[in-house]
């Protein structure tokens, strides 16, 4: 969504920070430290947007959200898609999350948000230059360390994100290689594409 939003702003003629950056998603992992890092070159967010969307939910307590999620999945599913709410499901597998982001708006300061998901968070300005977009570093719980293994991440990406129109790289290897054939005219499709789909 962040990349689509940036493309939309660019098509409108908006003056965008770091406009030379390719639109892409990069995923890294460290199976020794049990971390996953997800970065995009999308629209990013401002400090105010971070507080309004992620911070407000933190104040109300992601611990309560996770409790509701485990007790009554149907009721919670109605709000999962809202910005911020779905993000908090990361704390089902993470003991800490750090978000670093810089808005596409040229004069905005980059910010860092940090939380253990228990209701409090820290937000601070980032000194130095970082590129437009967002990086999320996930510190996994010991019992969920399998998600920091390459084969597991690759499997998840291929299952849930194979048809994303932007490239997704896992440790510099493009993972989403199947094009969304439903977007192509039938006359342009090859039998191999159809069979692979």
Where are these regions (language model features)?
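GHKL (Bergerat-fold) ATPase N-terminal catalytic module, capturing the glycine-rich phosphate-binding loop
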Residues: 1-142, 146-147, 155
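ATP-binding catalytic core of ATPases
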Residues: 103, 120-197
